[in-house]
Structure formats: structure tokens, C-alpha cells
């Protein structure tokens, strides 16, 4: 069973380097390593608490990134990256907020990028996170309802054929609205939805071209959720097999198990486990530090966490949970883990190189070749 494809995703953090240099370097690496796509995040600030974004926990990366919460705007950056885009590489946002941006503006931005890239834009979209909405006055009581309406609005505008369109909606009503940008050669950007809960999975089946969850931790959970997406697609009269089963996953690798275990103990890496719902923690006999019923990454507000709070939370992360949250191990072990997910339906993985945040510069450098070996191995799956 083959056909697995992969892409890279980077955070758009302002650094001491020229704004586009890190992204263009990653794009070049993606091309060399055979990646299908390059993605950027969409955040007003970081998901890493600023209280631990120091050299003590980030190592040399903290010298290049003096302010972890200084994030570039993704669509502006993607427009720049579209110039000189390597052949066949696709560009995507992973993922944009459905509520913080009016869906008409999102539809326009994605359609513009699709024209700039000659049909290689991907619109990744989800509910977003509380940290990028509520502090800025965006209503957050019903994020899933807003998401459903945003997705329906984008599709309605793209399918309007340049005719006036009116549509009732509790969040994004259209009254004689006009959307006249053309698709590229008859095709709109693919919509990839970051869905996890039942309603989001149903919306994915109705509207999306791909499903790209971020916090599904077990392959068995992945296959069950994929069935829900496909069932919703069938109910909507769509071909369920036309929806690409994807996922965003971090990779922690190194020369040997000792290096990997050391990287997994990083406070910054452990913070990713806070984004996992409380029920996943409970399976390992530990209550989520933010409450047994905590929903996960969408409700974290990291900029308010002080150092002691972060360290106390990190100390509670079960080692077994950490190994579910990311692919980890030697290159061969990581490839075997990805293969297991493939056997549960995964066909596309968007990768975060978690080895880059090791506080040890030497360990970060020595993880480069093992990471490249993983990527070469993925092309054979």
C-alpha cells in the first residue's frame, strides 16, 4: 500500500533574519527532500508561552527569535513566497481561523494565492484557538457554529459564478454580495479542515477536500474519525474517497534513543501535550493540569502562563502520552510509526520538525541527518 505524501509546516515568527529567509530556506529543503507542499501557520501570537521562550529552554533558537509572540501575517507572507515558487510545490496555510477573519476575506485571499501560484494554493481552515480570538474581542462562545457558517459562506461565494448572492446566517449573512474572482483553470483552492469533534468531522465530510487534524494522538482514533468524515461525505452525496486523509504531526528524532529521550524531556516539546484533551491524559492515569474536562489546544491562552505554571504543567506530562503526541524515535522507528498510521488510513502528513527546539545546539545539529533519513523513508511508504 503506497501513495503517502508529505509537506513541511513552519511558524511565521519574526527573527533576526530577513523575514522571508527562513521560509524560503524551508521551501528549498522541502523541494530537495521531495515534499509535496509547504505550509505556514496563522497566529497572532505563539502557542509556546513567552515565559519559557528563553535560551534556557529554546537554546540558540532564542537568540534568533527574541520575541516568540511576534508573528507575521500568513497571507501576506504566502503572497511573497508565491514569487519564484519551486515547480510542483504547493503552498498552504495551516490553518487559518474561521472566525477571526471574515470568510469573504478568506475566500478572496485563498483565491488570490491560487491565481498567484497557478493552481497550487491550499486553504487550511479550522475554528482557531481562544488565544488568537477572545483577547481581541472575537466572540468565542460558539466557535464550531461560526466555523460551519464560515465554511458554507466560502463555498457559496466560490460557487456563485460572479452573480449577486444573498444568504442568511447568524454570523456571516450575505445581502447582494458579489464575488467575481475566477478560479484557476476552473478549480478553486482545496479546502483542508482541521477537525476533531463530531460536528467538525461532519462539516469536513460536507465541504472539505481533505481532513487535517492536529491533535489526534492514536492511529485507532484516527481511523474512527476518518470513518465519520467519510460517512458525512456519503450523506452529503459526495464521494467519500475523494477526501484526502491527512494529519499534522511533529517528529522528534536523533542518532540514538538517548538523544530522542532527551529531546522529549524538553519543556517546550512537553508543552505540546497540553494541547491534547483531558480524556487522553486520563488514559495514562493523570488528570490534565488544566482540568479533567479540558478540551485541548483551542482553549489554551499561553501568553498568560508564568514560568512556574508552565514548569509545573510540564512535569506532569506522562512519558507514554508524549510518545503518542509526536512521532519519536530513531529514523527507522519513526518510519514504522508513520507506516502504522498509514495502515489506519493516513495518506498525507504535514510535518513539524520538533528536533529544532532542543536546548542543546549540538543535539539539534546532530538530528539533521536522522530527520532527513526519515523523510527519505517516507517517500517509500
Curated annotation (Swiss-Prot):
E.C. code: 1.2.-.-
Q: Which GO terms describe its biological process?
A: lipid metabolic process
- Entry keyword set: Lipid biosynthesis, Lipid metabolism, Oxidoreductase
Question: Which GO MF terms are attached to this record?
Answer: oxidoreductase activity, acting on paired donors, with incorporation or reduction of molecular oxygen
Q: Which residues form a coiled coil?
A: none
Q: Which GO terms describe its cellular component?
A: cytosol; plasma membrane
InterPro entries hit by this protein: F420-G6PD/mer, Luciferase-like_dom, Luciferase-like_sf
Origin superkingdom: Bacteria
Entry annotated with the keyword Lipid metabolism: yes
Q: Which Pfam families match?
A: Bac_luciferase
Which PANTHER family does the UniProt entry name for this protein? 5,10-METHYLENETETRAHYDROMETHANOPTERIN REDUCTASE (PTHR43244:SF1), PTHR43244
Q: Which family does it belong to?
A: Belongs to the mer family. Phthiodiolone/phenolphthiodiolone dimycocerosates ketoreductase subfamily.
Q: Per its database record, what is this protein's job?
A: Catalyzes the reduction of the keto moiety of phthiodiolone dimycocerosates (DIM B) and glycosylated phenolphthiodiolone dimycocerosates to form the intermediate compounds phthiotriol and glycosylated phenolphthiotriol dimycocerosates during phthiocerol dimycocerosates (DIM A) and glycosylated phenolphthiocerol dimycocerosates (PGL) biosynthesis.
Protein name, per record: Phthiodiolone/phenolphthiodiolone dimycocerosates ketoreductase
What is the species of this protein?
A: Mycobacterium tuberculosis (strain ATCC 25618 / H37Rv)
Q: What is the lineage of its organism?
A: Bacteria, Bacillati, Actinomycetota, Actinomycetes, Mycobacteriales
Amino acid at each position: 500500500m503506497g501513495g503517502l505524501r508529505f509537506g513541511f509546516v513552519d511558524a511565521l515568527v519574526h527573527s533576526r533574519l530577513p523575514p522571508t529567509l527562513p521560509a524560503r530556506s524551508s521551501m528549498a529543503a522541502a523541494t530537495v527532500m521531495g515534499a509535496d507542499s509547504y505550509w505556514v501557520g496563522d497566529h497572532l501570537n505563539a502557542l509556546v508561552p513567552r515565559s519559557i521562550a528563553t535560551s534556557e529552554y529554546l537554546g540558540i533558537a532564542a537568540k534568533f527569535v527574541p520575541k516568540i509572540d511576534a508573528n507575521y501575517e500568513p497571507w501576506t507572507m504566502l503572497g511573497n513566497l508565491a514569487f519564484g515558487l519551486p515547480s510542483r510545490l504547493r503552498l498552504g496555510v495551516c490553518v487559518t481561523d474561521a472566525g477571526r477573519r471574515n470568510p469573504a476575506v478568506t475566500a478572496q485571499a485563498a483565491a488570490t494565492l491560487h491565481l498567484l501560484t497557478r493552481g497550487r494554493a491550499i486553504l487550511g481552515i479550522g475554528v482557531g484557538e481562544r488565544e488568537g480570538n477572545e483577547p481581541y474581542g472575537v466572540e468565542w462562545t460558539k466557535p464550531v457554529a461560526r466555523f460551519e457558517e464560515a465554511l458554507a459562506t466560502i463555498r457559496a461565494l466560490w460557487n456563485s459564478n460572479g452573480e449577486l448572492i444573498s444568504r442568511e446566517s447568524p454570523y456571516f449573512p450575505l445581502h447582494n454580495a458579489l464575488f467575481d474572482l475566477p478560479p484557476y483553470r476552473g478549480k478553486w483552492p482545496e479546502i483542508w479542515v482541521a477537525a476533531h469533534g463530531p460536528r467538525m468531522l461532519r462539516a469536513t465530510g460536507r465541504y472539505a477536500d481533505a481532513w487535517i487534524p492536529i491533535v489526534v494522538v492514536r492511529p485507532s482514533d484516527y481511523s474512527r474519525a476518518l470513518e465519520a468524515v467519510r460517512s458525512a461525505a456519503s450523506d452529503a452525496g459526495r464521494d467519500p474517497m475523494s477526501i484526502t486523509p491527512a494529519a499534522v504531526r511533529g517528529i522528534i528524532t536523533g542518532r540514538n534513543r538517548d538523544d530522542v529521550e532527551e529531546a522529549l524531556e524538553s519543556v517546550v516539546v512537553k508543552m505540546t501535550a497540553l494541547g491534547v484533551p483531558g480524556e487522553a491524559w486520563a488514559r495514562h492515569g493523570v488528570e490534565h493540569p488544566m482540568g479533567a474536562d479540558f478540551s485541548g489546544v483551542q482553549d489554551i491562552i499561553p501568553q498568560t502562563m508564568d514560568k512556574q505554571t508552565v514548569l509545573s504543567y510540564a512535569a506532569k506530562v506522562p512519558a507514554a502520552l508524549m510518545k503518542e503526541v509526536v512521532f519519536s524515535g530513531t529514523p527507522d522507528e519513526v518510519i514504522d510509526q508513520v507506516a502504522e498510521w498509514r495502515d489506519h488510513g493516513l495518506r498525507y502528513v504535514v510535518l513539524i520538525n520538533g528536533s529544532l527546539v532542543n536546548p542543546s545546539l549540538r543535539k539539534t545539529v546532530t538530528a539533521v541527518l536522522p530527520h532527513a533519513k526519515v523523510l527519505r523513508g517516507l517517500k517509500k511508504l
